[in-house]
Amino acid sequence: MDPKNKVALLTGGARIGQAVAHSLALLGCNLALVYRGSRDAAEATAQAAIREGVRAITIQADATDEDQIARAVQETDRELGGIHILLNMASVYLETPEPKKVDWSNIVDANTRSVFLFSTAAAPIMKRSGAARIINFADWLPASGRPRYKGFVPYYTSKAAVVALTESLALELAPEVLVNVVAPGPILMPPGLSSAENDEVIDATPVRRWGGAEEIAKTVVFLVQSDFITGECIRVDGGRHLY
């Protein structure tokens, strides 16, 4: 599918979302940027897209609230004339050393249920276009088939569920909507990472570097433009899963 003159709805994503939005804008894709609290970042991303000659709007919505999700989808359709690409990037990354004491619903709602709600809300509009794409976001860890790190039980479980949900949606929404999932690995160095911790990540990554947000953007564009891939999980982790 050629993204030119199409409409993409993006949820969350922060720095990676900005790179994805920019790449789509360069290809002539109009954007609806859904944010919960980062209004300034969303507005800056929208203005950057507008400078590239496309339409871009921002919508404040909580990705765990079904009514707000429905409103965001309807506003995108009304203002931009459809939805051809849905990028479910909103996520919560939370360390939980004592998972029995954590409210799992907050993590599962943000990471998994939001994907289902946005996808099912947008699906009728997307099917109407005849050709559409849903791209979800998981994590290289659950995509690797083993957790590796202690203290992230709800997060790991919720992201593994996104992979399974992607496969289910791919079957349910075919042939009009192709549904895939991206599983990022060491893409952006977290703030506050020590030199020793950075070295540990690099040593455990075969390509010996952080990927950068542009690698995710290129993967998204590939999945948008591909016409015969659905129900697939693509790890973008520099080979991190091999260690």
State what each model feature region is.
Residues 29-43:
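Conserved glycine-rich Rossmann-like NAD(P)H-binding loop of the short-chain dehydrogenase/reductase
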Residues 92-96, 127, 133-161, 166-174, ...:
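Catalytic loop of short-chain dehydrogenase/reductase
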Residues 209-236, 241:
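C-terminal substrate-recognition "lid" of short-chain dehydrogenase/reductases
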Residues 174-178, 230-231:
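Short, small/polar-rich loop/turn modules that mediate ligand/substrate recognition or access, typified
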Residues 70, 91-106, 146-154, 191-196:
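Conserved mid-core segment of classical short-chain dehydrogenase/reductases
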Residues 2-32:
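Canonical Rossmann dinucleotide-binding motif of NAD(H)/NADP(H)-dependent dehydrogenases/reductases
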Residues 110-130, 170-175, 221, 225:
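Amphipathic alpha-helical dimer-interface segment in Rossmann-like NAD(P)H-dependent oxidoreductases
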Residues 84, 100-117, 135, 155-158, ...:
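Catalytic Tyr-X3-Lys loop
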